[in-house]
Amino acid sequence: MGCVTSQEDKAAVERSKQIDKSLRMDGEKAAREVKLLLLGAGESGKSTIVKQMKIIHEKGYSQEECLQYKPVVYSNAIQSMIAIIKAMGQLKIQFGHPDRAEDARQFFALAGHADEGEMSAELSGIMKRLWKDVGVQECFSRSREYQLNDSAEYYLNALDRISAPGYIPTEQDVLRTRVKTTGIVETHFTFKDLHFKMFDVGGQRSERKKWIHCFEGVTAIIFIVAMSEYDLTLAEDQEMNRMMESMKLFDSICNNKWFTETSIILFLNKKDLFEEKIKKSPLTICFPEYTGANTYEEAAAYIQLQFENLNKKKDTKEIYSHFTCATDTNNVQFVFDAVTDVIIKNNLKDCGLF
């Protein structure tokens, strides 16, 4: 009888050890699983960050995948030109050369029938002539007065290359493409022995109600702000300043009861565009109380402070801020490396392994 009890005790001890081991393994596995939620207003650069993860942490874009973006490149270039020509009418800007008015008429006729994935020599020729026109360039320089894609200048400057026979989009061309994100896009990758699940959520106001079920159990939120949009209004609401909308959204995320334990990482994005714009467009457009110089360093630091000051729990919650250029692979790689180190440290702490 005593022998049986002893065997039962041994079995119980063994079971207990197995349970402990299993719990430990589950804890370590949980510490290695990272759920990242990408949040931010529309057109802040969330989808570009997702594309960079594919380039940096997966195998990048194959030639076949790049070719799939060809229609998007053409569509972005054509839509940008359409936006500029239409804005010339609104802003009462004349073409520099009278022949360009006929080119514009031809352009609209051809643009509507452009074969998907192809750009005819006639269409590209017209677009090149229009893009060189001084009136078109004047209108482009006033793009804050209407809605224009960030990639407009990039593609229109590259018309020779992108309209050449046999054109295959480069990874940089792919990074610059703009397609509105609807719904939720999930990306998986492994980095530093961590298994990442990244969720890109539609930033336009109409999409926000779809976010909520992504929130539970999220490791960190990467909130993306387009710094260069301090002087722009929303595509969905011409009265609302984009930076103010971004701050409003950040306030609601940062101080949300669901995220008291969640790391908040702030990407102050489009720093390259901001650096160019701040020379011409004063920060007081968005922040009338700003008295600093219109230099990149001072103005960028001021924007960072405005966002960090929205944090109502400074004693217990830290905002990890980074200045980013989402189209610059090296910059994103460097920043994401730093972000991952913070996540590892916080994850191990949460799982009692640090």
Curated annotation (Swiss-Prot):
G-alpha domain mapped to chain residues: 32-354
Pfam families: G-alpha (PF00503)
G4 motif: region residues: 265-272
Region of interest (G3 motif), residue spans: 196-205
InterPro entries: Gprotein_alpha_I, Gprotein_alpha_su, GproteinA_insert, P-loop_NTPase
Binding site for Mg(2+): S47, T181
PROSITE patterns attached to this UniProt entry: G_ALPHA
GO molecular function: G protein-coupled receptor binding; G-protein beta/gamma-subunit complex binding; GTP binding; GTPase activity; metal ion binding
Gene3D superfamilies linked: GI Alpha 1, domain 2-like, P-loop containing nucleotide triphosphate hydrolases
Family: Belongs to the G-alpha family. G(i/o/t/z) subfamily.
PANTHER family given in the database record: G PROTEIN ALPHA I SUBUNIT, GTP-BINDING PROTEIN ALPHA SUBUNIT
Name of this protein: Guanine nucleotide-binding protein G(i) subunit alpha
Organism (species): Lymnaea stagnalis
